[in-house]
Design a protein with these regions (language model features):
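Short alpha-helical donor nucleotide-sugar binding micro-motif in glycosyltransferases
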Residues: 193, 311-316
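Donor nucleotide-sugar binding/catalytic pocket of nucleotide-sugar-dependent glycosyltransferases
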Residues: 166-233
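Acceptor-binding helix/loop patch of EC 2.4 sugar-transfer enzymes
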Residues: 43-45, 76-95, 141, 145-187
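Conserved acidic donor-binding segment of nucleotide-sugar-dependent glycosyltransferases
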Residues: 356-357, 361-367, 377-382
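Aromatic "clamp/platform" in nucleotide-sugar-dependent glycosyltransferases that forms part
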Residues: 324
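Short hydrophobic beta-strand element within catalytic cores of glycosyltransferases
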Residues: 332, 341-344
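Conserved donor-binding/catalytic core segment of Leloir-type glycosyltransferases
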Residues: 226, 240-259, 265-270
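Nucleotide-activated donor-binding/catalytic signature segment of Leloir-type glycosyltransferases, i.e.
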Residues: 288-310
C-alpha cells in the first residue's frame, strides 16, 4: 500500500496528509525541495530571518522517508535577496517558482522509476503544477496517480478571472498570474488532470470545477482543518454588541479582486466611517495609492505573526471574504475560531461553514449590493454578533486537521485495496 508523496514546499495541508499516511503505514517516501534540521550546526550560523525561513521546512518524519531536492529552490530563495530578482521572474526566470516545480517534478519522476522497479510503491501523490513528469513515469509502471487540487481547476479559474478583468478593468492589475499563465503551463495542468486516477479536493467549489472530461475519476473531498490556537477560547465577549463605536469589518488575504476586494470596497462606500470601519490585512498587489484612491478611509494592517493576527481578529466584529476564485481559504476558519461571523461567497470553498443566520451569510460573487445588505443587517443586529460569533467558533472547531488527513488516508486505502481486487479478477479472467 506504499505511497510516494511529493510537494516542493510542504505547506500545512501537505504535512497533514503526510502525517496521516505515516500513521496508516502507507507512506513510502516524502519528497520536497529544502529541508532543515533544527539541530544542525549550519542552521545556527544563518541570519535570524533566513534561519526562521529554513526552519519552516522541518519535517518530523523518519529520515529514511524524507528526500530533498534543494538546489534550485535555494537559488530562488536567496538570489532575489541579493538583488538578482530577474532570476525568479514568473515562468521566465531560471529560478522562478515554475522552474523549481518542473525541476522538482523531474527529480521525483527519476525516483519513481527506481522504486517502481523494485515494487516498493503502489501509488504517487502529487500536487498541481508539480505532477506531470511524476505521473507519466508512474503510468509506465502501472502505478496509481493521486492528484490534490488545492484551488479551482485552471479552466474555471481563468474563466472567472477574465470575466472580472472585464467587469472591473481597473482591478485587473491585482488578478495576478492566473490570467497570464502561458499555454505551456496550462497544458501541463491539463496533462496532470488527464493522468490522475484520484483527485483530492478541499471542498465543493473545487470539485465542481473538475472538467467534464475528468468526471469519471475517483474524487475525495476533505475540508481543511481549522486552526486551533492557544487562544481559541479567548472569545471577545460582548464587543460585537458595542454600538458606541463603528462596526469593524475584517478582510484578510492578498489585496486583489480574486478575493473580491473591489466588491467589498464598493460595498463599504455605502456607509459612513462613523458607522462601519473596514480593516484590511494582507499583501499589496498594487501601490497603496491605488487602494486609497478607491476607498480613502479603510484601515490597512500589514502581515504579522499568527498570535498578532488572532489579536487583530478579536478586535473586529465580522469577517468578509467575497472571493471570486479560491480553493478553501483557511483564514475563514481562523476568523471563526476567534468568534467572528462570516460574510463569504460559495467560491471561497467554505459554503459548508455557513449556517444561515447562525455562523454568517453567503452572498453571490461579484455583488457589492449583497455585501452591503448583509453589513447593514449586522449594523441593525449588533446584539446578535456575540451569539453568532460563538456559533461560528463552535462550528469551526468541528473541522480538524486530523479529520482532514485521516479521511484522505482512509479513502485512498479503500480505493487501492479495491483496485488490487479488480486487477486480481482480471488476471484470473
Amino acid at each position: 500500500m506504499n505511497i510516494l508523496l511529493s510537494h516542493p514546499t510542504g505547506n500545512r495541508n501537505v504535512r497533514e496528509v503526510m502525517a496521516a499516511l505515516l500513521r496508516a503505514d502507507y507512506l513510502a517516501e516524502f519528497h520536497t525541495t529544502v529541508t532543515a534540521d533544527p539541530h544542525s550546526r549550519w542552521i545556527k550560523v544563518l541570519p535570524e530571518n533566513f534561519q526562521k525561513e529554513c526552519l519552516r521546512r522541518h519535517y518530523d518524519i523518519p529520515k529514511g522517508k524524507l528526500k530533498s531536492h534543494p538546489y534550485l529552490e535555494l537559488a530562488r530563495l536567496i538570489l532575489p535577496k541579493l538583488g538578482m530578482k530577474s532570476v525568479a521572474d514568473h515562468e521566465k526566470g531560471w529560478a522562478s517558482v515554475d522552474a523549481v516545480y518542473k525541476d522538482f517534478d523531474r527529480s521525483v519522476a527519476d525516483r519513481v522509476k527506481y522504486l517502481a522497479k523494485d515494487e516498493k510503491i503502489k501509488a504517487v501523490y502529487a500536487y498541481e503544477d508539480g505532477a506531470l513528469e511524476t505521473f507519466r513515469r508512474a503510468k509506465e509502471y502501472g502505478l496509481k496517480c493521486i492528484y490534490e487540487l488545492p484551488i479551482a481547476y485552471w479552466e474555471t479559474s481563468r474563466k472567472l478571472l477574465l470575466e472580472e478583468a472585464k467587469r472591473l478593468p481597473e482591478w485587473s492589475i491585482t488578478l495576478g498570474g492566473g490570467i497570464h499563465d502561458s499555454e505551456q503551463k496550462l497544458e501541463r495542468k491539463t496533462g496532470e488532470m488527464e493522468l490522475a486516477d484520484v483527485v483530492v479536493c478541499p471542498g465543493k467549489f473545487v470539485s465542481d470545477s473538475i472538467p467534464l472530461s475528468a468526471k469519471d475519476k475517483h474524487v475525495i473531498i476533505s475540508p481543511f482543518g481549522s486552526p486551533l490556537p492557544h487562544s481559541l477560547f479567548a472569545v471577545k465577549g460582548e464587543a460585537g454588541g458595542d454600538t458606541k463605536r463603528p462596526l469593524r469589518v475584517l478582510f484578510a488575504g492578498s489585496m486583489g479582486q480574486r478575493k473580491g476586494l473591489g466588491d467589498l470596497f464598493e460595498a463599504i462606500r455605502h456607509f459612513s466611517p462613523k458607522h462601519v470601519e473596514l480593516v484590511v490585512m494582507g499583501s499589496l498587489l498594487a501601490p497603496m495609492e491605488f487602494y486609497k484612491k478607491k476607498l480613502p478611509h479603510f484601515r490597512y494592517e500589514a502581515g504579522r505573526p499568527n498570535d498578532q493576527v488572532l489579536a487583530l481578529m478579536q478586535s473586529c466584529d465580522i469577517f468578509c471574504l467575497p472571493s471570486i476564485v479560491e480553493g478553501r481559504a483557511l483564514v475563514m476558519q481562523e476568523a471563526m475560531s476567534q468568534g467572528l461571523p462570516l460574510i463569504i461567497t460559495a467560491n471561497t470553498g467554505g459554503e459548508d461553514l455557513i449556517l444561515h443566520g447562525q455562523t454568517g451569510f453567503l452572498v453571490p460573487p461579484g455583488s457589492p449590493e449583497s455585501i452591503s445588505e448583509k453589513i447593514s443587517w449586522f449594523l441593525d443586529h449588533r446584539n446578535e454578533i456575540p451569539i453568532m460569533g460563538e456559533s461560528a467558533r463552535r462550528h469551526a472547531s468541528m473541522y480538524t486537521w486530523e479529520k482532514y488527513g485521516n479521511k484522505i488516508s482512509r479513502e485512498l486505502g479503500g480505493y487501492l485495496v479495491e483496485d488490487d481486487k479488480l486487477q486480481l479478477r482480471k488476471v484470473r479472467g
